[in-house]
A protein has these predicted regions:
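Internal hydrophobic alpha-helix adjacent to the cofactor/substrate pocket in enzyme cavities
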Residues: 232-239, 348, 440-457
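N-terminal Rossmann-like FAD-binding beta1-loop-alpha1 element of flavoenzymes
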Residues: 18-43
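A glycine-rich dinucleotide-binding beta-alpha-beta segment and adjacent secondary-structure elements
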Residues: 169, 346-430
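Core beta-strand elements of the Rossmann-like FAD/NAD(P) dinucleotide-binding domain
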Residues: 13-16, 184-192
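An anion/pyrophosphate-binding glycine-rich loop and adjacent beta-alpha core
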Residues: 230-232, 236-346
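Extreme N-terminal leader/targeting segments of oxidoreductases
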Residues: 1-18, 36, 424-426, 430, ...
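Glycine-rich loop(s) and the adjacent beta-strand/alpha-helix scaffold that form part
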Residues: 188-252, 446
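Conserved N-terminal/central alpha/beta ligand/cofactor-binding core
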Residues: 5-10, 40, 46-160, 164-169, ...
C-alpha cells in the first residue's frame, strides 16, 4: 500500500479532540476507535513513513476463546491464556493489565473482522500450549497486513495521519492536565493525548542506562524506537516501571548490515534449532528468554533454524527471507550439512530422531510439546543462521487498565493515555510471541474508548 499519510504542511489545524502520537497498530487502532465514537483525532508520526515498529511484526496475534479457534476445533478458557502468559513473564506481570488483556482478545479479533480485517488461520508460539496465534489466511506477516488495512480504515474515516512531525513536549494547562503537543511546526492542542510511540530498543542511551550488559547487542527494531513517549511523559511527572526488563529474541539473522527477525511462526510450524554440530540443544518453543539463553550458552553463540518445504509453505515470510539471501537451500540433508559445515551424519540423525518424536508426539530429549504437526521430511531442506538480538522492551510507562498514565504517587495524569510497547507491566520479564500485536489492538481500542468517554463527559 502506498504511503497515503499527510505531510507536515498539511497539518493546518491547531486543535483536535484527540492527539495520538505514533502510527503503528496501537496508534491507528486508538484513533479509529475514537473516531467511530465521535471524536476528531489526529495521528502525529515522527518518521517519514507510517506504521512504526508494527510493520516488522511477523508471526501473528494471540487471543483465546475465539470463533476462529472453534472453527479449528480448539476449545479453551481465557484463564489458561492468562496463566501461561503469567508464567512466561516470570509472574512479574501486572495482574490487572494481564486480566484485561487475556479476557479481551476475542473481542479484538472480532473488532478487526468487523472492519474487514480477517485473521482466520492459526499457528503457535513459544510458551503457549494451544494454537492462539491468529494470522491472515494468506499467511502474510501480521504487522504490515494490519497496518495497511488499518490505514485504509483511517483514510475512510478521514483521520489525518501526519508524518515527519516529532512531538517535542507535552503541553499542560494551569491545572497540570495534558492539553496538547509542541512540535517544531506549531503547538497543537487537544482535549487529550495518547502516547503510542513504542519502546526504546533503538535508544543506545536508554539501553546503556538500564541494561549495560546489552550495549553491544543489535536490535530487530526500526530506528524510530527510541523511547520518545517515555521521555515526554516523564517530563510531566509520569512513573516508569520495569525498565530493566528488555527482551532478547532468539532467532535473528545478523550476517548482513541489516538485522532480520526470523519470526516465531517458523518454529511454531515445525522448525528445529541445531548447533554447530548439527544437534538440537533446546526445546525450540520454550519462552524467548530460555531459548535465547540456550543459544548464548553455545560455544559459537549462534545456531541454525532447520526446516523443510512443508514449513516453508506454511510461513510466507520465508519467501521474503529468501529474497534477502538469508536462507540456505539444499536438495538433501547431506547437501545441507555440507553447506552449513556440520557433520552430515549428525544432522541426519538429528532429523531422524526429531521425526520419530513427531510421529510419537513425544520429545524425550527436550520435552517439546507444540509445533509437532508434521515431520521434517519433504525436500528441499532449508536453514537460516540466527543469533539473539534485542527485540522488545517490557518496561515503560505505568498505566492502569483504562490506559491512564499514572504519576509516581499512582495518580492519573489528567488528559494523558498510553497504549502499546510504550507501556510497562503487561508482559513481566518475557513477552510471549504474538502478545505484542494483541496488546496494540486490545489497549489501542481501550485508549480510544476511554479517551472518548472522558472527553464527552
Amino acid at each position: 500500500m502506498a504511503n497515503t499519510a499527510n505531510k507536515p504542511n498539511d497539518l493546518v489545524k491547531e486543535d483536535y479532540d484527540l492527539i495520538v502520537i505514533g502510527s503503528g497498530c496501537a496508534g491507528l487502532t486508538c484513533a479509529i476507535q475514537a473516531r467511530e465514537l465521535g471524536l476528531k483525532p489526529v495521528i502525529l508520526e515522527k518518521m517519514e513513513t507510517f506504521g512504526g515498529n508494527s510493520m516488522r511484526a511477523s508471526s501473528g496475534m494471540n487471543a483465546s476463546e475465539t470463533i476462529v479457534q472453534l472453527k479449528h476445533g480448539i476449545v479453551e478458557d481465557w484463564h489458561d491464556f492468562y496463566e501461561e502468559t503469567y508464567k512466561g513473564g516470570g509472574k512479574l506481570n501486572d495482574p490487572e493489565l494481564l486480566e484485561y488483556f487475556a479476557s479481551h482478545g476475542a473481542l479484538a479479533i472480532d473488532w478487526l473482522a468487523a472492519h474487514g480485517i480477517v485473521l482466520d488461520d492459526l499457528t503457535i508460539t513459544g510458551g503457549m500450549s494451544k494454537m492462539r496465534t491468529h494470522r491472515p489466511k494468506s499467511l502474510a506477516p501480521i504487522g504490515a497486513f494490519l497496518v495497511n488495512n488499518l490505514m485504509k480504515r483511517a483514510k475512510e474515516l478521514e483521520i489525518p495521519v501526519v508524518c515527519g512531525v516529532k512531538a517535542e513536549r507535552l503541553l499542560t494547562d494551569e491545572k497540570g492536565a495534558v492539553c496538547g503537543v509542541k512540535t517544531a511546526q506549531r503547538n497543537v492542542y487537544a482535549k487529550a493525548v495518547v502516547l503510542a510511540t513504542g519502546g526504546f530498543t533503538a535508544s543506545k542511551d536508554l539501553i546503556a542506562k538500564y541494561r549495560t550488559d546489552l550495549k553491544a547487542y543489535r536490535t530487530t527494531n526500526h530506528a524510530g524506537a527510541t523511547g520518545d513517549g517515555i521521555k515526554l511523559a516523564e517530563e510531566v511527572g509520569a512513573e516508569v516501571m520495569q525498565m530493566d526488563l528488555v527482551q532478547v529474541h532468539p532467532t535473528v539473522q545478523q550476517d548482513t548490515d541489516h538485522v532480520y527477525l526470523i519470526g516465531e511462526a517458523v518454529r511454531g510450524e515445525g522448525a528445529v534449532l541445531v548447533d554447530g554440530n548439527g544437534k538440537r540443544f533446546v526445546n525450540e518453543l520454550s519462552t524467548r528468554r530460555i531459548v535465547s539463553g540456550a543459544i548464548t550458552a553455545l560455544k559459537e553463540k549462534s545456531a541454525y533454524l532447520v526446516f523443510d518445504s512443508q514449513v516453508k509453505k506454511r510461513v510466507k515470510a520465508v519467501d521474503f527471507y529468501q529474497k534477502q539471501g538469508l536462507v540456505v537451500e539444499a536438495k538433501t540433508l547431506e547437501e545441507l550439512a555440507k553447506k552449513l559445515n556440520v557433520k552430515e551424519n549428525d544432522l541426519e540423525q538429528t532429523l531422524e530422531k526429531w521425526n520419530q518424536a513427531v510421529e510419537k508426539k513425544q520429545d524425550s530429549e527436550f520435552g517439546r510439546k507444540t509445533g509437532m504437526e508434521r515431520e521434517l521430511n519433504q525436500a528441499p531442506y532449508y536453514a537460516i543462521h540466527i543469533a539473539p538480538a534485542i527485540h522488545y522492551t517490557m518496561g515503560g510507562l505505568h498505566i492502569d487498565k483504562q490506559t491512564h498514565v499514572l504519576d509516581k504517587s499512582g495518580n492519573v495524569i489528567s488528559g494523558l493515555f498510553a497504549c502499546g510497547e510504550v507501556c510497562g507491566g503487561l508482559h513481566g520479564n518475557n513477552r510471549i510471541g504474538g502478545n505484542s500485536i494483541s496488546e496494540t489492538i486490545i489497549f489501542g481500542r481501550q485508549a480510544g474508548m476511554r479517551a472518548a468517554a472522558e472527553i464527552k463527559k
